[in-house]
Amino acid sequence: MADQLTDDQISEFKEAFSLFDKDGDGCITTKELGTVMRSLGQNPTEAELQDMINEVDADGNGTIDFPEFLNLMARKMKDTDSEEELKEAFRVFDKDQNGFISAAELRHVMTNLGEKLTDEEVDEMIKEADVDGDGQINYEEFVKVMMAK
């Protein structure tokens, strides 16, 4: 899995990894994993983090070494880039299947994910992604936002 990463990606991950490997022992604690991944532009949920940690932390000691971390990031990046997964995610947001994500649909999904957002926050998220300015997010705009993560 990690062999599909470019040298640039590997050195970027190594740099981020060592920022959080405070004592330089080659391991990071599980609670630091989320921070590391967010610093690399990934945005895992708590549930995703727990799943990833469970997959990697076989002995349950709460730490992850660099090779395990690389495999994790490679897997996460592969998932993120998958066209089918993007379409599926878009369909989850686009409740009425009209090809657009409205503010109401975005708020609904985010609430279901446990993210209670104000109207202003929802509007801001829409505005950030809404390239053509129609007040909704179409599939192309959605993909652009997801790929930028």
UniProtKB/Swiss-Prot annotation:
Domain of life: Eukaryota
Location in or out of the cell: Cytoplasm, Cytoskeleton; Cytoplasm
CDD domains reported for this sequence: EFh (cd00051)
Pfam annotation, one family: EF-hand_7
InterPro entries named among the record's database cross-references: CALM/Myosin/TropC-like (IPR050230), EF-hand-dom_pair (IPR011992), EF_Hand_1_Ca_BS (IPR018247), EF_hand_dom (IPR002048)
Record carries keyword Transcription regulation: no
GO CC term (a single one): cytoplasm
Binding positions for Ca(2+) 4 per the UniProt entry: D130, D132, D134, Q136, E141
Cleaved signal peptide residues: none
SUPFAM superfamilies: EF-hand
Gene Ontology MF terms in the entry: calcium ion binding
Keywords linked to the UniProt accession: Calcium, Cytoplasm, Cytoskeleton, Metal-binding, Repeat
Binding residues annotated for Ca(2+) 2, in chain numbering: D57, D59, N61, T63, E68
Domain EF-hand: 8-43, 44-79, 81-116, 117-149
Amino acids binding Ca(2+) 1: D21, D23, D25, C27, E32
Residues the entry annotates as binding Ca(2+) 3: D94, D96, N98, E105
Sequence similarity: Belongs to the calmodulin family.
Subunit-structure text: Interacts with KCBP and CIP111. Binds to IQD1 and IQD20.
Entry function: Calmodulin mediates the control of a large number of enzymes, ion channels and other proteins by Ca(2+). Among the enzymes to be stimulated by the calmodulin-Ca(2+) complex are a number of protein kinases and phosphatases.
Additional notes on this entry: This protein has four functional calcium-binding sites.
Protein name as annotated: Calmodulin-2
